[in-house]
Amino acid sequence: MIERHLAATLDTIHLFGSAIDGGLKPDSDIDLLVTVSAAPNDSLRQALMLDLLKVSSPPGDGGTWRPLELTVVARSEVVPWRYPARRELQFGEWLRHDILSGTFEPAVLDHDLAILLTKARQHSLALLGPSAATFFEPVPKEHFSKALFYTIAQWNAESDWKGDERNVVLALARIWYSASTGLIAPKDVAAAWVSERLPAEHRPLICKARAAYLGSEDDDLAMRVEETAAFVRYAKATIERILR
């Protein structure tokens, strides 16, 4: 499907994320990074996103497909590296309703590409073209840190994580790990690492989030309103101290 829509400009396809590093968990996405030699126009972008809905299922849906997350970048926008870099297209299940209603996100400058490309360079499989470590330049530590800081800035009040508590808690664990080590770890690995560094009052929440992610316990973080808010505040403050 990707080749059918982008064949004329397709440079590389890299599989990364849980499928390569740590193994797929019950709700894990299939993460793909696609590089093209020229930015797709609006009609091509929209046609591809509509088709991708056919090979992706919402998390926990029990459908034939796993959730798909696909990012498309133009080679000239990321090689040589610059920050923030431009993202041509992003597809994910959180966009399904918008896509079906005819709302398509345009190309944007994306701070998160600094994290994504670092992740792909560390752990990925080239499905087309050279390895990510060969194709992409290293992201400078300064830009990686800025992207981490930019990411945590979005979580300030309960409304920012309501309905997505587990993912936000685990994302903060990964960011804490990355800010401290410069590396990117699977969610469960980062959560275990963080749990060893947390005050006792925050450990039950991170352990619960990790167990729910692994599928060994039910996800009840939505019921743990105060615990979640306290963890977010503590984790953010710790990460900010590390990054400054």
Model-derived regions, located:
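Structured mid-to-C-terminal alpha-helical surface segments
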Residues: L183-R244
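Catalytic metal-binding acidic patch
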Residues: I13-K54, P58, P67-R75
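Short secondary-structure junctions
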Residues: I2-D11, G60-T64
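Non-transmembrane, amphipathic alpha-helical segments
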Residues: F136, D160, D164, D220-M223, ...
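Short, solvent-exposed loop/turn segments at secondary-structure junctions
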Residues: I20-D21, E77-V78, R174-Y177
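Conserved NTP/Mg2+-binding pocket subregion across the NTase superfamily
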Residues: L50-K162, V169
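Extended, basic/helix-rich recognition subdomains
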Residues: S145, F149-K208
